Amino acid sequence: MKKFALSVGSVALAIFSFLYIQLYRVQSSIGEQLAQQNIAVQSINLSLFPPALSLENIKTTQFSVQKLEAKLNFLPLFYGNAKLHSLNLQQITLNQNTQNSANISMDLAPFSLNQLLSQKVMLNGESHIRVEFDKPIYGNKTFNFTFNKANLDFSKSKSALIQFVNASLNNQPLGYIETHADFRSPRQQMVTYIKPMCDNDCLAVLKYQQIDNQSEVNFSGKYFPVKRLFALLNLPEVLNGHADFNIDFTFLHSQLIQGKLNILAQNGEILGVNLLDMVSQYFPINYNGDLLQNKELNTRFEQFYLQLFLQQNQLIAEKIELKTPALLGQGKGIIDLNRMECNMDINLHSTDQRYQNLTLPINFFGNCSSPQYKINFTKKFRHQLIDAIKEKLR
């Protein structure tokens, strides 16, 4: 019995020794690779139970990380092929003057540590990335990104290639994403193409450029689904259809300081409001049955144009233009991004030339998804209404 116990103990000791040797080799390989790439690390630690890798105070010319923790798969260690399936990065910042850091947690399809060290990673399987900023960006602190496949190639000196398949951000499907980036030059640049599944040739392009402490983002697209666009922009879901858009954001020390948005939505609906049914109560117009048969709380439109700019936690709508078969509208307003409340003043006109001088002023307020409204019965509107009724009775 003692011999048996001694034999078992010897085998266990041999296995543990072998595993620790493997871990030591992994640790040495990591240290060598980091030194070759001019990445400074204060300490590298490996543990066996559970298999994990920890790096502290990582610094490069592009970013710094206070702590990186990686979880390893146990069995591949026997073959000298360490595989990772989880990464956590604490207090990551893009440069020393950045005033907004982030924590990133990743649950990934298992991949080889050798791939990571060679800067070419292939991921096959469902993966999740969660990014949480210390300070909100555009009213949001947390971003959840998922995908089924990925190719991450940072091996070239001047350009990185990043590809995602079946990607989604904050539960909004984005489809295929391809990014070309240069983070090593003084003027860091990135171009991302987003190709979602849609019933037309839709495409969005995200351009990023950073010079010193200031960065600029341009986000533009053609025939892009409005619902997905508004979800990405953290806007209330008030429209559907497809949109052409052009958006510019400026950041200083990673804080958003300026934003301009131009969005032209086409062939969609205003959700939660039936303007035609509302207007028919006040305009002396006999709309045909086809226009009034849709009694749901939506308004179909041909075009809906928004020109907005960002002011702290509010979006100021400088210009709102609406075109439907029966109505034309112009207006302006404010969207509170923190409370998702809207205050919009819209002037509605009939497309019927006989009533082109009659303007119905409406104020929408409260929750953007289900707003309340009031008609501004000004003296001017009363005179217009009286004149329109007289004209109709002639």
Briefly describe each language-model feature range:
Residues 5-19:
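Hydrophobic membrane-insertion alpha-helices, especially the h-region
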Residues 15-98, 362:
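Terminal hydrophobic membrane-targeting helix
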Residues 146-149, 177:
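Extended beta-solenoid/beta-helix repeat architectures
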Residues 37, 61, 80, 122-123, ...:
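Extracytoplasmic/secreted proteins and extracellular or luminal domains
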Residues 28, 35, 42, 99-119, ...:
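N-terminal secretory/membrane-targeting helices
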Residues 393-394:
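Short, solvent-exposed mixed-charge patches
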Residues 52, 57-59, 84-110, 127-137, ...:
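Small-residue helix/turn framework positions
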